[in-house]
């Protein structure tokens, strides 16, 4: 129920008051939470907006005040520095915060992306077919892009000397980065599969003009975006965290069941959104980033403990972080919804 301002998402509807009237009975107190999103409102965080529109957070006794994010990799650090109750963003950035012993780092409580969404896009006719082919090439991306930030893991996994890859950063939009690559400005572009696909559609460029080197297969132990909460909230108000996780899970189930309703929820907040691009972006997210086969066994929200531990250890080694934290220090499974309530329908082969 929230719309974008320059700094904050405040409600397109009136924000719920501190006390909301029940259905003819006693008033229900609402807990207000400050939430940092991965970006502005889009199809890839629409489980929040659809959950708001359908009253899932209200039913859980919660009112969410949203703040626009600056990219998934910045969410964990900003949540720690700015005191957010809740954040949604990349779990690998959270690993970095915990590995550096940041006492204010949040903790993940619901794993949204059970695959890494990151890719390196290259022109369809490029000779780059494997990570080894990146040696001597120029790859460009946003400084805080998840693919760029986790590239050391990919390089280490494939014994590629990362220093042999020329990496530059740019503040240009993703559409400009990819079309610039196609014009010969660089050999590859860091990004998400879904984001690059949406950028191409928005720019009117055939998606077939690019190919992807997908981290999901090249660094299979890495996870992606997760719901995080402050450690103080988890410690002092665990019932609130349980309620939040249940409501978000209901939102994910609603999005998976009705993508059209999810896109409509986004459009109500971003009337100028490019609908075909956002539809493709959501489809890539649901079937790709949330489609790991383990989802059939675990459902969305949970992690495979051994895989998660391998992935965070690989990240810490590749980025020479001060320590390798225990998986439980990064992801707290105590707040998981019951297995029977988790969404397993997105799992791929």
What is each model feature region?
Residues 308-349:
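Conserved C-terminal helix/tail region of periplasmic/extracytoplasmic solute-binding proteins
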Residues 29-183, 187-194, 213-215, 220-221:
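Short, glycine-/small- and polar/acidic-enriched structural segments
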Residues 236-318:
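Secondary-structure end/capping motifs
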Residues 119-121, 226-229, 233:
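Short glycine- and hydrophobic/aromatic-rich loop-to-beta-strand nucleating segment
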Residues 16, 26-27:
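Cleavable N-terminal signal peptides
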């Amino acid at each position: 129920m929230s719309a974008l301002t320059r700094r904050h998402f405040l409600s397109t509807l009136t924000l719920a008051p501190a006390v909301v009237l029940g259905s003819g009975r006693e008033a229900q107190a609402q807990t207000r939470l400050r939430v940092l999103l991965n970006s502005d409102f889009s199809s890839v965080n629409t489980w929040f907006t659809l959950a708001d529109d359908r009253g899932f957070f209200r039913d859980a006794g919660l009112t969410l005040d949203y703040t626009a994010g600056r990219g998934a990799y910045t969410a964990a650090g900003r949540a720690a520095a700015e005191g957010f109750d809740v954040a949604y963003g990349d779990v690998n950035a959270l690993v970095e915060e915990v590995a550096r012993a940041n006492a204010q780092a949040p903790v993940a409580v619901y794993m949204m992306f059970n695959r890494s969404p990151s890719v390196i896009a290259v022109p369809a006719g490029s000779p780059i077919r494997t990570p080894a082919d990146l040696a001597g090439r120029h790859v460009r991306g946003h400084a805080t892009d998840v693919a760029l930030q986790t590239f050391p893991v990919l390089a280490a996994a494939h014994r590629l000397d990362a220093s042999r890859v020329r990496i530059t950063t740019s503040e240009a939009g993703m559409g400009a980065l990819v079309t610039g690559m196609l014009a010969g400005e660089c050999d590859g572009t860091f990004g998400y599969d879904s984001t690059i696909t949406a950028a191409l559609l928005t720019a009117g460029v055939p998606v077939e003009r690019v190919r992807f080197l997908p981290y999901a297969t090249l660094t299979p132990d890495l996870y992606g975006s997760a719901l995080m909460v402050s450690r103080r909230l988890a410690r002092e108000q665990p019932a609130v965290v349980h309620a939040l996780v249940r409501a978000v899970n209901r939102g994910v189930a609603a999005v998976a069941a009705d993508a059209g309703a999810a896109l409509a929820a986004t459009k109500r907040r971003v009337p100028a959104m490019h609908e075909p691009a956002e539809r493709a972006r959501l489809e890539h997210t649901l079937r790709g980033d949330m489609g790991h086969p383990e989802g059939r066994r675990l459902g969305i929200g949970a992690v495979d403990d051994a895989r998660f531990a391998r992935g965070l250890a690989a990240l810490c080694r590749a980025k020479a972080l001060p320590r390798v934290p225990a998986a439980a220090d990064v992801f707290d499974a105590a707040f998981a919804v019951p297995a029977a309530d988790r969404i397993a329908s997105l799992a791929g082969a």
